[in-house]
Structure formats: structure tokens, C-alpha cells
């Protein structure tokens, strides 16, 4: 698995991105229907945290098998990997964060999810006519995308991955410094009432997995679509 992945521009349809899903795939399906998502030509990019908290977490494997769906590895995917592969995981914390469904699975089924999660990159770069758009789960430890790319490809330092998957610093500090080398960087992880843009960093987790709504962003235009689900 490459921790960094570059994807060519979509020449047939639209590329859309969405915030944290957390097992609410049916709500997301409604949102996509409202923006006329066409899986035969369109693609959907996720900032990670596909699972935990919501009732349809097991559907993550079905979505990841679709050729039009692409995701980075979030901290909840990383927790599942750590649990099965001998890492240190506070099980009480993991259950409180919605991981009980995974812990209850037979080990063979856990392995199927972990294999899929291990195949997810930490960082995605999607080409658009107006310039590249990056995706991470939480934040970039560098204000230069090239530095992050090279670090993930050649160094693979745990502290770099930790920032990419767990950091809330940018939002907490109101850091407006852009990440150079990108037109926009799309992240989730920290819930916000409405999409927040700091510099060129878009925070997309608007709580579609709880009482909020999914925010869907078109990559080519950076146009925000925020349909509210009915369930």
C-alpha cells in the first residue's frame, strides 16, 4: 500500500468530496441522489472515518469495492488496524468512539476490514483543470504538500501519520496559513457546524453522521453542496 496516491482528473464526469461518514452510508446515499451523483461517470472522495458510530459501518467494504469511491485512511480505520495488528488501543475508548461493532466481529471478518483499510492511503492528490486538490483525514504537518508527499513516500514517520489522522491544531488555533502546492486541501476529523475554510484548507465534517448534514464539495469548481438528509 502506498501512503500517498495521485489520481488523474476525471474527464467524463464530476469529482465530489465528502466529510466523515461514520457508518451513515444511507444518509450519504440520499445526499448523493440529491446532487444527481452518477456513478457511471462521477467519483466520490472521502476524507476517511468511514466506520464507527453509525448503523451501517459494515457497508464500508461494499463502498470501498466500488470503482468510483476513493478514501484516505482516517483515525477510526487506524484504530481497527492497531487493534488487530497488535498496536496499543484503549478498548474502552474504542467502544465509546463507536468501535463496538468491529470488536464483536469474528477475527476473520475483522481481517477483511483491516486488509481493506490498510490499502487506503494517508494522503490523496486529485488532479483538476485548476490545479491539484489534496485530501487528508485531519491536517497536514507541513505547509508544503511536496514535503508531506516525500515524507509519506520515503520516510513514513509515525508522528507525521499521527498529525495527518489525529490533529485538531489548525482549527483550534485558527491557522490560516495555506498548504503550498495545492489548490485546496480537504480534511475532516473535527466536527464543525458549517464548512470552515482556513487558508486553502477546507474542513468538511459537518456532522452528517449525527444531527448535522453531509457537506459535498465539487472539486473542479470548489462549489459546496450541502443537502440535508431526511433521516
Q: Where are each of the predicted segments found?
A:
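Active-site-proximal beta-strand elements of phosphoester/diester hydrolases
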Residues: 15-22, 133-139, 202-204
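Divalent metal-coordination and catalytic microenvironments
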Residues: 20, 49, 64, 74-75, ...
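Divalent-metal (often Zn2+) His-rich catalytic cores of metallo-beta-lactamase-fold enzymes
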Residues: 132-153
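Core catalytic region of metal-dependent phosphoesterases/phosphodiesterases
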Residues: 14, 18, 23-93
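Conserved beta-sheet core of the metallophosphoesterase superfamily
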Residues: 167-228
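Beta-strand-turn-beta hairpins that frame and shape the catalytic cleft
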Residues: 9-16, 125-134
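Active-site environment of divalent metal-dependent phosphoester hydrolases
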Residues: 22-26, 52-55, 78-82, 141-143, ...
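Active-site neighborhood of divalent metal-dependent phosphoester bond hydrolases
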Residues: 57-126, 130-132, 155-168
